[in-house]
Amino acid sequence: MTGYTTGGDMVQGEDVITRLSGLEVYLPDGRLLGLVHDAVIDENTMKCTHLFVRDTDPLLVEGSIHLAVPWRWVRGIDRIVVLRWFPPIPIPLN
């Protein structure tokens, strides 16, 4: 990927966060999790801590509920978001 990598740094800047909205989010094995709806920003550090994912696959997330994915799970971002890790599935509703 030629876009943003996560490394030890967190994405910063309003322009970057705006461009995340609507990107497809993929699991490490290539399955589509859903779409980025928004980013959660820590107000003290102004850094992204989570991506809020909508339209999740019901086979991966019970009830297709929206999901907050920790930034540390993100491997890289370009035209899509690729996760480095995702818990065993499906994610239960409770």
Describe each model-derived feature in a short phrase.
Residues 1-94:
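Peripheral interaction segments used for macromolecular assembly
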